[in-house]
Amino acid sequence: MMSLILYGYWRSSAAYRVRIALNIKQLVYESRAVHLSREGGEQHHAEFHRLNPSELIPVLIDGELCLNQSLAIIEYLDETYPAPRLIPERGAERYQVKALALDIAADIHPINNLRILQYLTAKLGVADEEKNRWYRHWIDKGFQGLEEKLRHTAGEYCVGNRLSLVDVCLVPQVYNAERFDLDMSRYPTLQQIAARLRALPAFAQAAPENQPDAC
């Protein structure tokens, strides 16, 4: 039986991040799908609720440890399975990497995740086109700032020439932006880095369309 078990959903940005990190570290894990819209959302079912009462994915199981929050999971993986590191061990670069990752995971992503979009349409009666405009507006605002920051930090990847937590966060967010038809040509630095990252096996294998539960 595998020690590492990842509960996720093929299109979840947060689960996508963890898949990338697991692949970069070449860790073998069992993937268990939690369908976010089937049967009212499997994340609300009792079995998953016991794992995470917040009813959000991803959740990582490692032996007796049950951990949620994608960035916490990746930091745990980085400390437990450190080769290769995604968060520098010390120095200013450590905090630069964390800050840029949080720009994506804490500022850009949360206001556009599935439960927010579902609330806009199901509870507030927002039409799909207006919902899509909402999505593009907030992604654009976030990407404008991120583009400017990465112009100063980027080398081959988001921070210099080594893969980091920022790269792990960037690609899933770009994937979602493209799903909602955001014009990525406005962010050439993000676009170039994302294209470079997507060509790497660890990122390609983690892509939503390559997951067993993709539909």
From Swiss-Prot:
It comes from the Bacteria. GO terms for biological process: glutathione metabolic process; L-phenylalanine catabolic process; tyrosine catabolic process. It catalyses: 4-maleylacetoacetate = 4-fumarylacetoacetate. SUPFAM superfamilies: GST C-terminal domain-like, Thioredoxin-like. Its EC number is 5.2.1.2. CDD domains: GST_C_Zeta (cd03191), GST_N_Zeta (cd03042). Residues 2-85 form the GST N-terminal domain. GO terms for cellular component: cytoplasm. One of its GO terms (molecular function) is maleylacetoacetate isomerase activity. InterPro entries: Glutathione-S-Trfase_C-like, Glutathione-S-Trfase_C_sf, Glutathione_S-Trfase, Glutathione_S-Trfase_N, GST_C, GST_Zeta, GST_Zeta_C, GST_Zeta_N. It is an enzyme of class 5 (isomerase). Keywords: Isomerase, Phenylalanine catabolism, Tyrosine catabolism. Residues 90-215 form the GST C-terminal domain. Pathway: Amino-acid degradation; L-phenylalanine degradation; acetoacetate and fumarate from L-phenylalanine: step 5/6. Belongs to the GST superfamily. Zeta family. This is Probable maleylacetoacetate isomerase. The gene is maiA.
